[in-house]
């Protein structure tokens, strides 16, 4: 059993001292590979065993591509701004800057202990002013292109946290109350002025871009569903006994004859004007109740609730009078905030109608039970009877639009991005306001975040930066301005950090994002070839990063429409009982402990051998032990030479070893290119088994084996390679396999009589049929089996089988 602690520390020091993994950008090398991890938020908890899974996968790819002659960019950095760092600093009475920098040191040390091939000169930190200067610059460009503006918006306000929360950061507690995901603090809806980025303007470009990338279909579906493009019709329903009208959005205008009621969102501005006096108190109580429910819960597949408004509308197609209801399953922030209820042909409408005993009218001929949502010929619809959906929609849309009763529209579920936070620990906006609240953009960047000792959020919605009096007010050309005191969300830095790695220079500076040198670098290194990270970032982070990148493409900063060519979401590592690891369950495993007991190489190779990269799989101590035993077995190939014969001439090795060796290189290469890392490891295991079986080694083959091993277990590979070489195994060239040597020279052919095996012969590959028959008939066992009986038929498949029919 080798001393992993001694060996791993030795080689980690060697790599750092010799800058073995220093980034190389050879202008004469057209082969580049950019492999990227989703950079971590440096929390106080450090790494757990789930983190190394994705990092090891990118590390294997990086090392493999380097062996194959690529210039490789495999960087690391820190997503260090944001609410979690600030909240933890408040709870522990620390400053977020001090706390964050301490955590970065811990994380960096842990990453180095696992042996990743990061060039730390390329490290980025979103809290570094040299970094966030360009975050601010991108915001300025968005503003100049009318994609950033201040809007009055109903937001999720958490008084205890002192900030606005996204819908995803709000959950329901045991009492069905809306609370913050972090800390469980009460959350209410509150109108506030917020910076908003108009990501909806890019919805179609983001959808189209999915056709240009290699994402899994499930990931593409997540993105498409989040954007939620709907092509439909806004129909105008007049309010009975009123001069008012209600715009209603539908994607199924062909079912308008079956509309039995309308539903408006509780927040709809028309509601106060149309609700009847008798229903006013009931409706108001319902509106107040809805404010406690998140949008996600409102549209979930649960029992729908609603109240009657006391008012009616007139169907423009047939003049029928139908009731107007109020229900929380309709959201004001999607389309018009009003829908028509067609219970016969919509599952949600059907459930609602059944619950409140509303009429149901079928307008599509079907023998199936209701609700029926498929195609068919229309009935009870005078203008379109006998027509299918497409024909009916064309006719009705033409009629309604021509008569100014409707218009064709495109809607998206995607909402514009609320981009401001009422917190301290974030990027300052490069924005000033004059005494008339007119905006002045700051071009001289970065706008530095002032150092505040008191940064506790207010209860009013005012940012802590409002307390930085010396920083707050600016005088320019004799005119006084007040700075924007909100800060950017944590998403900001992560929306472009993959570009920052390309711009980061050895001296710590950044090449300007808008420079010609940046364009030159981007031309070589973009897009990111492989991006690996957790499923939790499959929607928002990925969408925001794609949005910013597409915008930068549109203004000529980057040469590619999409930032990432291939995205892989690695599966989780679960507890031994298939449960998610958590402190409360006591099943969290610290990688530091595994490194101490089994070694970093064992941790790396075990996590890659567990199963497919995308699968979530349980941790197995037995599996970990087995991988350590295998590495010990590899070590003994070099240190138990008395048990093995050393054959110096490769040509004198037996056929099994040669075939296995070349098969290893071929299958290993294919497996890593397909991110099937467990298969690559299996191939290495087969090769080691064959060496032990034959009790033979050859140093040339073993050296090449160590080159393959170095992608997964770099410390041990370096140690064994150094026994006969002075240079690093990680900087060698990938061995090449010979396809011809994978094919055995001899083959064993079964001989059958009437389909039953009687004997086998070992012959040269591709021996012809006539020779095979002669060799078979010369065998005593075959002669005895045939005897004096005549052979009726001879069946021969070269290299496969001989069969005599008697």
Curated annotation (Swiss-Prot):
The answer to whether keyword Membrane applies is no
> Mind telling me which InterPro entries this protein's record contains?
aa-tRNA-synth_I_CS, Leu-tRNA-ligase, Leu_tRNA-synth_edit, M/V/L/I-tRNA-synth_anticd-bd, Methionyl/Leucyl_tRNA_Synth, Rossmann-like_a/b/a_fold, tRNAsynth_Ia_anticodon-bd, Val/Leu/Ile-tRNA-synth_edit
| Family designation | Belongs to the class-I aminoacyl-tRNA synthetase family.
- Which keywords accompany this UniProt record? Aminoacyl-tRNA synthetase, ATP-binding, Cytoplasm, Ligase, Nucleotide-binding, Protein biosynthesis
Looking at its record, which EC class is this enzyme? ligase
Q: Which residues form a coiled coil?
A: none
Pfam families the UniProt entry points to: Anticodon_1, tRNA-synt_1_2, tRNA-synt_1g
What is one process in the GO biological process aspect for this record? Answer: leucyl-tRNA aminoacylation
Cellular component, GO annotation: cytosol
CDD domains to which the protein is assigned, alphabetical: Anticodon_Ia_Leu_BEm, LeuRS_core
Subcellular location per the Swiss-Prot or TrEMBL entry: Cytoplasm
Question: Where on this chain does ATP bind?
Answer: 583
Which SUPFAM superfamilies does the protein's record reference? Anticodon-binding domain of a subclass of class I aminoacyl-tRNA synthetases, Nucleotidylyl transferase, ValRS/IleRS/LeuRS editing domain
Q: Which reaction does it catalyse?
A: tRNA(Leu) + L-leucine + ATP = L-leucyl-tRNA(Leu) + AMP + diphosphate
Where is the motif named 'KMSKS' region mapped on this chain?
580-584
Which gene name belongs to this protein? Answer: leuS
Superkingdom, taxonomy of origin: Bacteria
Quote the EC number: 6.1.1.4
One GO MF term on file is:
ATP binding
Native organism: Ureaplasma urealyticum serovar 10 (strain ATCC 33699 / Western)
Write out the residue ranges of the motif 'HIGH' region: 40-51
Please identify the protein, giving its name as recorded: Leucine--tRNA ligase
